[in-house]
Amino acid sequence: MIAKDSIETAYSFLHQKQRIYVHSTLDWQKDDIELAISDYANDMSQELYDAISGGRADFLRDHKRFQEDITKAVEILEKML
């Protein structure tokens, strides 16, 4: 079972970064956010990662799909709250 505080922490962090990412016009800032989220995903509980990733090993780690992935992750986490 996924701990409620793990869901809340992940939601807060990803939601904040997603809002900045979507509105940013700075490539370096977007790259920094992608790196921070990728690192966070690496350290996230495997059970929580599996719940939001849909089985994709590169979820939140693929530059080309990052905006789509982080938006999906925030939506899923919000429903889990």
Where on the chain are the PLM-derived regions?
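N-terminal acidic leader/helix
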Residues: 2-34
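Generic structural concept
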Residues: 8-11, 34-41, 67, 71-74
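Generic detector of bulky aromatic hydrophobic side chains
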Residues: 1-2, 9-15, 40, 58-61, ...
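Acidic, low-complexity, intrinsically disordered interaction modules
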Residues: 26-65
